[in-house]
């Protein structure tokens, strides 16, 4: 949902409220996080100011507004919406029941016809439409517009009006490095590339059985994670030993555990608990007092080491929080190739507009790929979005699987002339695919031999090496999920996105949040095997509904002055449902190359 800062300012000015630019930016972020439009957010804000009798509005007041007022109000609204959603699902079940009756009737009619002599007029013929005329040419010779005709799966589909009349086509929304004067075109399949999927220890390559996990198995995975990260923190900070959580001590103690909440609500600074590890604390829990900590950033599921006073064994007064330690960078070797710089194009779904099921954005993307011929194209799902109105209402005449196959065939055949390597990443919102995390790659058994060399179907999440440059890829809206749960206190100017990205790398996981969002179905045994970071990626790509950004971090080997910094030379991108182009030099792998701004990035 797009939120305009200008409209938000105008709504507040109606009530005589003047806010600083930083406050407006924070309000825009809250609008996206809590699904509010400009008018609704202004109304909630006025109600809060009236009830608390506040005349001026600061960032501190805004934090109180979020925790004490907005989250409670929105939770009630969502509870009411869940009831309405149940009614809509009931209507969808009726549609399915009618469809089943029609299919049974057709089967009976087919059985009856098998005992009679078929008439000449009963022979089936291929249905043709103006968009898909019947020709003698093979399917592969047709254009993408003919391959992906919406009339084949949605006769009522109409062209998207807003998309076709948009005025910002091709607009550059942000850039990094020497984006100006760079030739944004690759060599397609002309230059040799080394493409490898990394795992921890092996990547996920196929489906697995899920919905069979037991609670002790989940507990074991979480315990292993605490022990592994605790061991790294102990070695890095030279900690002698961890103390048991429930044992009183008059001297400062150092405790290892996982952050949790004392209730089912949202985490706040008064509801933080520390759940100890199995070896030292037998999994016991203790409330944490954060009043002595000047700076902290916490979320449920975070593995931390805390130092503090535990005189009673019933509450820890934390005085120090140890920062997590990221994994080392991957060091390129001879197998990673020795090519010149290469161009990567990234796009994320959905590839339809909200008001139409036609794939006009996808067809435009194919045109751009054929024009610019990038060396690698990374395409994130969803390809057929489960949240699309026509999908939710079951208005498609073809099965979800058939529509996806038609979409995938259009991408592969439509870009064949470019020679670009295709990396296809699934999404939990792909309506036809397995809704479990980590998510297996798509299956496509009918790939031609010439396409098998350039098409790579990978899992969600995935760690990919392109000529030794490591890309961390995830289509899950991790920024949105963790942004809604994280609490922080900081005397500096660090922003929420930088902190979240820091957590992802220091927790060494593509989804460190526990418990996860309600719509996330995580299989924890496979999560432990396939959703951990094998190395710190050079580039971390996380599409999100939140605003796009590019963030760069520092370490001792890199001296880049950048306003937004977060960690260890890694480069993080949120494409925010837009396309971006990137050019990567040979020297970028292993966390180097950012120093001279030799990486060029452009988001459109």
From Swiss-Prot:
Region (Disordered) location: 109-171
Sequence ranges of Low complexity compositional bias: 143-160
Polar residues compositional bias, start-end: 113-141
Post-translational changes noted in the entry: Phosphorylated in a cell cycle-dependent manner, in G2/M phase.
Keyword Chaperone: no
Residue list for modification Phosphothreonine: 129, 132
Compartment(s) where it occurs, according to its Swiss-Prot or TrEMBL record: Nucleus
Notes concerning its domains: The N-terminal 240 amino acids are sufficient to mediate complex formation.
Protein name: DNA polymerase alpha subunit B
Species annotation: Bos taurus (Bovine)
Gene name per UniProt: POLA2
């Amino acid at each position: 949902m797009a939120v305009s800062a200008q409209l938000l300012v105008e709504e507040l000015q109606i009530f005589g409220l003047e806010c600083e630019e930083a406050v407006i930016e924070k309000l825009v972020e809250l609008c996206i996080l809590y699904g509010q439009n400009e008018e609704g957010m202004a109304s909630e804000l006025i109600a809060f100011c009236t009830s608390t009798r506040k005349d001026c509005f600061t960032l501190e007041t805004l934090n109180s507004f979020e925790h004490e007022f907005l989250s409670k109000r929105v939770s009630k609204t969502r509870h009411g919406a869940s009831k309405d959603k149940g009614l809509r699902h009931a209507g969808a079940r009726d549609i399915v029941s009618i469809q089943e009756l029609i299919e049974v009737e057709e089967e009976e009619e087919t059985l009856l016809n098998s005992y009679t002599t078929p008439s000449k007029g009963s022979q089936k013929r291929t249905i043709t439409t103006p968009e898909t005329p019947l020709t003698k040419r093979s399917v592969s010779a047709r254009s993408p517009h003919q391959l992906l005709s919406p009339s084949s799966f949605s006769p009522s589909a109409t062209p998207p009006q807003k998309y076709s009349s948009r005025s910002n086509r091709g607009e550059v929304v942000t850039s990094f490095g020497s984006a100006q004067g760079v030739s944004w075109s690759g060599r397609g399949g002309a230059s040799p590339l080394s493409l490898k999927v990394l795992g921890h220890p092996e990547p996920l390559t196929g489906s697995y059985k899920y919905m069979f996990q037991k609670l002790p198995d989940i507990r074991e995975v979480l315990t292993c994670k605490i022990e592994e990260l605790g061991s790294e923190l102990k070695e890095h900070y030279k900690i002698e030993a961890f103390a048991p959580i429930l044992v009183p001590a008059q001297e400062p103690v150092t405790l290892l555990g996982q952050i949790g909440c004392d209730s089912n609500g949202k985490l706040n600074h008064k509801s933080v608990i520390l759940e100890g590890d199995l070896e030292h604390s037998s999994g016991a829990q203790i409330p944490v007092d954060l009043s002595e900590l000047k700076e902290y950033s916490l979320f449920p599921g975070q593995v931390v080491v805390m130092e503090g006073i535990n005189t009673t064994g019933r509450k820890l007064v934390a005085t120090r929080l140890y920062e997590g330690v990221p994994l080392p960078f991957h060091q390129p070797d001879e197998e990673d190739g020795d090519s010149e710089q290469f161009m990567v194009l990234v796009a994320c779904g959905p590839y339809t507009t909200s008001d139409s099921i036609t794939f006009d954005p996808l067809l435009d993307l194919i045109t751009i790929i054929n024009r610019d011929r990038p060396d690698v194209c990374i395409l994130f799902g969803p390809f057929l979005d489960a949240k699309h109105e026509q999908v939710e209402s079951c208005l498609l005449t073809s099965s979800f699987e058939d529509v996806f196959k038609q979409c995938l065939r259009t991408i592969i055949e439509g870009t064949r002339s470019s020679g670009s390597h295709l990396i296809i990443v699934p999404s939990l919102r792909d309506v036809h695919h397995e809704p479990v995390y980590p998510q297996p790659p798509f299956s496509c058994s009918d790939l031609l031999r010439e396409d098998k060399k350039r098409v790579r179907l990978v899992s969600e999440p995935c760690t990919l090496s392109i000529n030794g440059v490591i890309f961390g890829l995830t289509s899950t809206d991790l920024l949105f999920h963790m942004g809604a749960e994280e609490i922080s206190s900081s005397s500096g100017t660090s922003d929420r996105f930088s902190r979240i990205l820091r957590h992802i790398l220091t927790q060494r996981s593509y989804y460190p949040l526990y418990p996860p969002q309600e719509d996330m179905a995580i299989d924890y045994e496979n999560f432990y095997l396939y959703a951990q970071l094998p190395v710190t990626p050079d580039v971390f790509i996380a599409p999100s509904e939140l605003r796009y950004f590019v963030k760069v971090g520092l370490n001792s080997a890199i001296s880049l002055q950048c306003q937004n910094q977060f960690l260890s030379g890694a480069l993080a991108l949120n494409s925010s449902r837009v396309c971006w182009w990137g050019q990567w030099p040979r020297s970028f792998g292993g966390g180097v190359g950012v120093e001279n701004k030799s990486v060029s990035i452009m988001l459109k």
